[in-house]
Design a protein with these regions (language model features):
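Short acidic-glycine-tyrosine-enriched beta hairpin
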Residues: 65-80
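Structural motif
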Residues: 58-60, 67, 83, 92-93
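A cytosolic small-molecule/anion-sensing beta-strand core signal
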Residues: 55-56, 71-72, 90
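Glycine- and acidic-residue-biased ligand/ion/polar-headgroup-sensing regions
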Residues: 48-59, 64
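Ligand-binding loop in jelly-roll beta-barrel domains
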Residues: 80-104
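A short, N-terminal "cap"/entry segment at the start of jelly-roll beta-barrel domains
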Residues: 1-27, 109-116
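Conserved short histidine dyad/triad with adjacent acidic residue
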Residues: 31-45
Length: 116
């Protein structure tokens, strides 16, 4: 398994970005992200549609040619295969849902006994 496990169930996947997979089903997966100020999520894309909700903090999200500064209560949608990246402007917490399931995030499930 890749990443650094912490006692609270989060795994650092990129410097300053920690994930905990909360639950998943047949066609979607939900994860919580702890994002440190000044962390950068590099430009990437994936075949999963992605929606998110910012609980705490402030981030700058780049999706294709659009740029948005997000604050608590804001949400977003990233289409399948859309190129995106993010800059973390304040310590932040976000919840994101991926469809179909991101198979690479199943290893970050907090409780191995979670039932689909």
């Amino acid at each position: 398994m890749n990443g650094i496990h912490s006692e609270n169930g989060y795994t650092e996947i990129i410097k300053g970005i920690r994930i905990k997979t909360l639950c998943y089903g047949e066609s979607m997966l939900m994860a919580e992200f702890l994002l440190r100020k000044d962390a950068v999520l590099p430009e990437h894309s994936h075949p999963n549609e992605q929606t998110g909700y910012l609980i705490k903090g402030k981030i700058r999200l780049f999706i294709e040619d659009a740029v948005r500064e997000l604050v608590p209560g804001d949400s977003w949608n990233i289409a399948t295969d859309a190129i995106h990246r993010a800059e973390i402007l304040e310590d932040s917490v976000a919840i994101e849902v991926f469809s179909p399931v991101r198979e690479d995030y199943l290893k970050f499930i907090n409780d191995p006994d979670v039932v689909k």
